[in-house]
UniProtKB/Swiss-Prot annotation:
Protein name: Melanocyte-stimulating hormone receptor
Highest rank taxon of the organism: Eukaryota
Keyword Lipoprotein annotated: yes
Residue numbers on the Cytoplasmic membrane side: 64-72, 141-163, 212-240, 301-317
Ranges in the topological domain labelled Extracellular: 1-37, 94-118, 184-191, 267-279
Keyword Zinc attached: no
SUPFAM superfamilies xref list: Family A G protein-coupled receptor-like
InterPro entries associated with the record: GPCR_Rhodpsn, GPCR_Rhodpsn_7TM, Melcrt_ACTH_rcpt, MSH_rcpt
Protein's gene: MC1R
Family: Belongs to the G-protein coupled receptor 1 family.
Pfam families: 7tm_1
Transmembrane segments: 38-63, 73-93, 119-140, 164-183, 192-211, 241-266, 280-300
Glycosylation (residues): N15, N29
Main location: membrane
């Protein structure tokens, strides 16, 4: 079903916040004086992208440098870093292109600008999809390592991991290309929102199950050492905090953007929804922030990777 306004392109509001042709065409009467619009300065946007770029490049270099990290788990982490890198770079690239065009420093044809916009949109959408896929892949990998520890190396082999990585990248690029081609259909947005909810549900179920298994192990150890109450209390607090941080950051950083897509389908012209649409830049900034946080959660907690990172930094100096 063809989509109504406001949806010419998924990231058009991102462009229109800086151009003179507003995509949403919101008037004061539509949004009301109570509407809260959080403005994200271009400098902050570019700074977040630069931090994400440097951080994720260091993760990729560290994993590539250390042969001890050439395992399925670290391959998934490396691909997550690469996806996060592309998310940040593509969004920042579009921001930079808009600023350059606004300043009149780049004179080019409309068709060329449209082609550049298509390429950047494919990068943005593809990197977002691949980032979500690799977050799910890391959760599955950790689940297998805990519940099938003795068979882990026979289940998660390097060839299978490589095929999974190739499949994720191919699916991400293909889906993003289809999205750009059929951006004006509600089915596209519904597929993206469904994919996000499925990834969130998968991660929640797997990590909660892993937390329950770890709790059982802690209970058994506590009974052996006769320190059951203290160990249980400490483990519950630490495990709950870790799970809350892991899923909480994922939901807070990605949730607003996919809520934005959902509201475009459900209430494209409602005043409350129209007010929400005006904050797309904030939602994109949260996604870039997630690209900064991901290495701290998934990569830098590894002592081996931290040691390699120190070597990389020392060599660069």
């Amino acid at each position: 079903m063809p989509m109504q306004e406001p949806q010419r392109r998924l990231l058009d509001p991102f462009n229109s916040t800086r151009t003179g042709t507003p995509h949403l065409k919101l008037s004061a009467n539509q949004t009301g004086p109570w509407c809260l619009h959080v403005s994200i300065p271009d400098g902050l946007f570019l700074s977040l992208g630069l931090v994400s770029l440097v951080e994720n490049v260091l993760v990729v270099i560290s994993i590539a440098k250390n042969r001890n990290l050439h395992s399925p788990m670290y391959y998934f982490i490396c691909c997550l870093a690469l996806s996060d890198l592309l998310v940040s770079v593509s969004i920042v690239l579009e921001t930079t292109l808009i600023l350059v065009l606004e300043a009149g420093a780049l004179a080019t044809r409309v068709t060329v600008v449209q082609q550049l916009d298509n390429v950047i949109d494919v990068l943005i959408c593809g990197s977002m999809v691949s980032s979500l896929c690799f977050l799910g892949a890391i959760a599955v990998d950790r689940y297998i390592s805990i519940f099938y520890a003795l068979r882990y190396h026979s289940i998660v082999t390097l060839p299978r991991a490589r095929w999974a990585i190739v499949a994720i990248w191919v699916a991400s690029i293909s889906s993003s290309t289809l999205f750009v081609a059929y951006y004006n259909h509600t089915a596209v947005l519904l597929c993206l929102v469904t994919f996000f909810l499925a990834t969130l549900a998968l991660m929640a179920v797997l990590y909660v199950h892993m937390l329950a298994r770890a709790h059982q192990h802690a209970q058994a150890i506590a009974q052996l050492h006769k320190r059951q109450h203290l160990v249980h209390q400490g483990f519950r607090l630490k495990g709950a905090a870790t799970l809350t941080i892991l899923l909480g950051i994922f939901f807070l950083c990605w949730g607003p953007f996919f809520l934005y897509l959902t509201l475009i389908v459900l209430c494209p012209k409602h005043p409350t929804c129209s007010c929400f649409f005006k904050n797309l830049n904030l939602f994109l900034a949260l996604i870039i922030f997630n690209s900064i946080v991901d290495p701290l959660i998934y990569a830098f907690r590894s002592q081996e990777l931290r040691m390699t990172l120190k070597e990389v930094l020392l060599c660069s100096w």
